């Protein structure tokens, strides 16, 4: 029987909320948390918290990849970012957290992958799409940029 997998974080003020959580569903409406509702993966690098994750399966290798925004409000909102979303947008991480698995159970150690440049602010909300015509993957994300004085976000 097939199931849907929901890869998500929880909006909580404690560090365990900004980690990778899994839930499964048979119908896409009724969900059951896995791992007793505790994080399946923990972020130990960068901001030590992750949000906005996406999962993709590599067509060639069959491996699963999770990419996530490197951001922890529970650890950094007060001290690192002075309670300011603008400061996060300007000074947040330009890396994405990344994990790899063959079976959705056993995962690699977290890897930080640099996507942003020095002209960008925080790299947010990644997603991955497969271009079947060219057999390539495209990772895109949102970020503020120096070219518009770090105003509106753009998608890269």
Regions found by a protein language model. Name each.
Residues 1-123, 129-156:
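Beta-rich carbohydrate-recognition and catalytic domains
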């Amino acid at each position: 029987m097939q199931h849907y997998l929901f890869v998500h974080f929880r909006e909580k003020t404690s560090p365990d909320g900004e980690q990778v959580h899994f839930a499964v569903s048979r119908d896409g409406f009724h969900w059951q948390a896995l791992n007793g509702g505790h994080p399946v993966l923990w972020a130990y690098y960068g901001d030590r918290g992750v949000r906005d994750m996406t999962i993709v399966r590599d067509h060639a290798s069959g491996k699963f990849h999770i990419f996530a925004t490197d951001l922890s409000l529970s650890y950094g909102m007060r001290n690192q970012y002075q309670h300011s979303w603008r400061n996060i947008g300007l000074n947040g991480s330009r890396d994405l957290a990344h994990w790899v698995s063959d079976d959705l159970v056993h995962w690699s150690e977290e890897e930080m992958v640099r996507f942003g440049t020095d002209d960008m602010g925080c790299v947010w909300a990644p997603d991955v799409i497969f271009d079947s015509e060219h057999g390539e993957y495209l990772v895109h994300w949102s970020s503020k940029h120096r070219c518009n004085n770090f105003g509106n976000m753009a998608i890269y």
